[in-house]
Amino acid sequence: MITFKPITIEDKAEIESFTLPYAPANCDLAFANMFCWQFQFKTAWSVVDGFLVIRFQIGGSDRIGYMQPVGAGDFTPVLRHLEEDILAAGQRLRIIDMTPEGLEKLRSVGHCQFAFASDRNLEDYVYNASDLRDLPGRKYQSKRNHINRFEAEYEYRYEPMTRDHAAECMRLEAEWRKTRSGHTGELSAEQRAMQRAFAHFDRLGLIGGCIYVGDKLVAFTYGSPINDHTFCVHVEKADTEYDGAFTIINREFVAHLPEQYTLIDREEDLGIPGLRQAKLSYHPAFLEKKYTALCLYPDEIACKRLWIKCFGDEETFIDSFLIGHYSRKRMLAAEEDGRLAAMLHLIPFESELGRA
């Protein structure tokens, strides 16, 4: 078994000795994200054969996942250690946030037959810093119009964020949340993560910015590096009564970042239509694909083979089903001579009439 330990603030330097030189543009590999959300995912880490290995619990369940090992060179020798570790936990190997290059390496290893799938909802939006700073050309005309109206209507100032801004920022976040999902009085997971961020602001190396109109905070944002040239925006909030506040904080913040950060990762859209539209409106340079690799059980392999034989669907489609929807409890199967001959999958869904 691998000896993992929970991520703590004291681990920042060692973890970043792997992520800053080698990590892809993936928001999940920003140390501040791993630390601030540790309470949610029980994130733990270890160094195995010269690679950083991150382990976590998926969706609040007991299911274990590993991130693609981070380091220089070929990570595939680390796989046998992951297999031993997950076997000791009585589960099967699941690796998430794999790059396309990592996926190809995994395909070439005969340890296990994997299913691979990506989720558009979890792809990171990565922008050229110069585009967000300068808003050049016709495609950014609407953004420049927003800024021009804001600057014409309000006397504003930009302030670099410090821990002293925490109380004001949390109040604005609470007001913003009321307009989005209704106020329950309960502390959301994001609010807990923000509290951790502000409590350790300096030690995390966070960089943030605030927009004031007079003495009123109307927008704020903060983030941290993923690697030595990619900066990740973790949080961005604004008072929507001030038209253009989101646009102005976006531009001003990037304009005040160190020049070494040529790429800006604004994280994923989680499949939320409004968020997707907003992120696309800034014209990302690319979307960072993240693949999940799942070691298949024998019955799943048999299911996949029969599916291909009968229907000829692409493996990517079948793999996506196996990772996201397959369940032994909802599958009816018929065998002949010890081989799977027919199968029926029952998939629950929500309709206007209820759950079916």
What is each residue range found by the language model?
Residues M1-C27, D134-A193, L294-L346:
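Short amphipathic alpha-helix that is part of the acyltransferase structural core
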Residues P6-V53, Q57-I58:
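N-terminal ordered "arm"
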Residues C36, A199-L204, L322-R328:
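Short loop/turn motifs at secondary-structure junctions and domain boundaries
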Residues W45, D49-I58, C210, D215-P225, ...:
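Conserved beta-strand in the GNAT
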Residues G71-T162, I264:
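Acyl-donor-binding surface of acyltransferase catalytic domains
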Residues A117-Y125, A285-L296, P348-G354:
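Conserved catalytic-core motifs of GNAT/GCN5-like acyltransferases
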Residues C169-D228, C232:
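A mid-sequence, solvent-exposed acidic-amphipathic segment
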Residues L206-A293, A356:
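Aromatic (often tryptophan-rich) hydrophobic motifs at membrane interfaces
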